[in-house]
């Protein structure tokens, strides 16, 4: 009988932990929001593009680049993880003409998970 109780306790502990496991497996840095917002239309060049993630990023392995409407890389755009908020990726943006632009990002969270994606915005005059 004394051997059965510890087994039951272990079984109960496992059953209680099961609902938590999917959340642990899904602990990647996801894009929480951006400025400018995805699919937005702007009247002029934004001073910078900001991408906020759900987890802190590894600065050495996280970055982004800007593409124009022809999917060519825009010179002068440079991305870096913010020195104060490690979940924020900031991109300086050169003067841009009217058109559609795509921010392509690839970030590594501090727990080493890779997340990649893109978002677009449009500039009108």
Describe the function of each predicted region.
Residues 12-20:
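Bacterial N-terminal signal peptides
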Residues 48-52, 110-125:
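Extended, polar beta-sheet/loop recognition surfaces of beta-rich domains
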Residues 92, 97-106:
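A glycine-anchored, Pro-Gly-centered beta-turn/N-cap motif
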Residues 87-91:
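Short strand-edge motifs at loop-to-beta-strand transitions and within beta-strands
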Residues 2-11:
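Bacterial N-terminal signal peptides that target proteins for export
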Residues 50, 55-77:
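Short, surface-exposed alpha-helix to beta-strand junction/turn motifs within ectodomains of secreted
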Residues 22-24:
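N-terminal signal peptide c-region/cleavage motif recognized by signal peptidases
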Residues 26-45:
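N-terminal edge beta-strand
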